[in-house]
């Protein structure tokens, strides 16, 4: 069967969709945000493919696998086992790294265990165990006729007279020994100074090198090795011999200091195994510590609350500081930064063993005196963090924690022995610290000879292939030791994609969710090459995507629409890209064919050179002393290839600087920089990112945007509610009173099933409505509170048209393209892009002062061309009110409408971190060194035509 037949798909908003998709092709599903693309791809095709596969397993196996709900569809034929690769960030486990997720690290461990050469950490001498035959061969390879002696080093740098050693040697029939570098007959050895360290080597044999000595040498070596615990020396008898002293070892041990290592095993290189993990940080690579910079506000005095929790409101702690100040003679009324270094040290780290006389005023007004050392603010926090059993206290104290690389392993996570094993000229931590692109080149050029070459051949092939796949999906700037929880959703998805290609499966249905997120146009071509490679292996690749290049490259395109939410859920057009382009009803087709387009502004808003935000000397992560200038009151786009430093510059430097100064944020970490100028032009900063608006099913757009409070007030104002004495709290599902107590306002009850997935069944008391019967009897304009929460934003906008406060907030949700989501939709079901737009609408609905800095990170995630047009209207509206809008973006349709561009590069990772171009889009398009300009130029020319 060469087709996938879908009949009667009704999942979510799909309207009885019938669709026939070709197998083993690259299929792109596109359409407006909320039109039903994910419902078709993930909730219908993937859910059914995965469910059928899991159902084929035994009941015992099924209990370990989560099973998906059966989608609402009549029939699906021609399905393969399905693998979904979504944007969810991979792991919040601090032990997961890029290397471990892609399994490259497992192969590297195997490589180092099988062909690595351990070296002594102190003397840098290879710890290679040699057989007696190898030792004999090495000696016989020396110039023939060389006069040599074979020594057994029985004492190494040890104090004493060692008389017993000499007696033992004589008893065994030995005649000579080398003591502290001088040769003596055993009967003539001078008395040794027992206070000094000595070295004693017994002469086991003396010989001239010639070919027939094999047997004799072998026996002599065995004698020497047994005497000196596996170590032997060959030294010239005369100083004029042209032979250097050679050390031989029969075990993995340093011949100089005796540092030994057991046989190399892969677990020695695992930081998740006690055998390999650094004992100081347990393989995490970082140590947490209470950071004085986070605890203290140095501009305030101790009396004003320089240290949170130790001010006048906390009488007990403040009295302690008062007694401390009296003892050491400093003032509580002086800014903390101006106190002497000694006084600061005492406050932060304690008085050591020195007793301080403390005076406390107890509840009865009596003065109590005690004398004891002062613990210190930071040790006090550490102790409380360690001892507390309260999650709230721990969470509060965690705000003062910072991390630093482990002082022992320097962030490599491995124990000392594992850090000193070499393959070629690199250790394992050196390879994992390289960007993937460089590691790929290194692995390609690594050639091992002989037995090692044979052992390493297969392992190296796997490593090279997997590194190449990461390069192909545009991740050449990542390092293998990068922690997985620092990856963006797009990066995590492309890592999974690379792992899947590495698996080399055939006959599978892959379903991907916007793999081009966070990718620069230049890297996009490589990603599309990867997708076609997956297809060419013999797989069906289904991609939910808005990227123009991906749609044009597809074998088959499905356009879902025509609108969003209830107005969507139908197949508007399907076929080859050309067929969709020429379809009269396809919105996607209109944008692809150029009948509709996102226009370039006729003229750019000029910048005022006197009104600039100036950031100097930014050098976080890979930034190379960058000086950034952002025009105030304009729409600025920060562009650059993936990994060039955009997020570090804006999210980790510009945002925390401005948020700390304008919003009073206290716990944000700022990447290193020299100076910042221009705060006088701003009064607040708003960061609109893609983190969830809430992590529980109780959070929803209505609660987040502040709509729910006025809605509850409306309901409590209904005559029936007033006569019953219901206040706004009655209509909250988070507190007792009006909610259904059987499900505590959740509307569903979780039922744990053992070998089936946990199921959530509608509460049989309230039938999923969250409220009790009495609350639901109150109606506003004929609707209950439950029915209002079930409305889409569009329906609610019409319903509350006469209530200006609500209408305005609902209109802003419509303006950012969220007309299709429900007011009470659980926050956990919103995508990153949707969550970001809910946040944007909340900011839009506030009265703006025209002096706000808005920062957005890739707001076009999940947006169709028509949605992008809506978003741009909103961003330009903010700009027209005098606000400063800074957007990190790869989408060329957004970039071309910006007033000002700042392009970072030239490449990603260590080859990036510089501003290579800034100016208007037209100016950047003419700059040959800018990758962004290269792709922008033809677009501007086409749109101006």
UniProtKB/Swiss-Prot annotation:
What PROSITE patterns has UniProt attached to this entry? ABC_TRANSPORTER_1, ABC_TRANSPORTER_2
Provide the alphabetized UniProt keywords. ATP-binding, Cytoplasm, DNA damage, DNA excision, DNA repair, DNA-binding, Excision nuclease, Metal-binding, Nucleotide-binding, Repeat, SOS response, Zinc, Zinc-finger
Q: Per the record, a Pfam family?
A: UvrA_inter
What protein name applies here? UvrABC system protein A
Q: Write out the similarity annotation.
A: Belongs to the ABC transporter superfamily. UvrA family.
Q: Which GO terms describe its biological process?
A: nucleotide-excision repair; SOS response
What does the subunit section of this Swiss-Prot or TrEMBL entry state?
A: Forms a heterotetramer with UvrB during the search for lesions.
Compartment(s) of residence:
Cytoplasm
List, alphabetically, the GO terms of the cellular component aspect: cytoplasm; excinuclease repair complex
Q: Where is the ABC transporter domain?
A: 310-587, 607-937
**Record's keyword annotation contains Nucleus:** no
Q: Name the source organism.
A: Pseudomonas aeruginosa (strain ATCC 15692 / DSM 22644 / CIP 104116 / JCM 14847 / LMG 12228 / 1C / PRS 101 / PAO1)
Disulfides per UniProt: none
Under the heading InterPro entries, the entry gives:
ABC_transporter-like_ATP-bd (IPR003439), ABC_transporter-like_CS (IPR017871), ATP_grasp_subdomain_1 (IPR013815), P-loop_NTPase (IPR027417), UvrA (IPR004602), UvrA_DNA-bd (IPR041552), UvrA_inter (IPR041102)
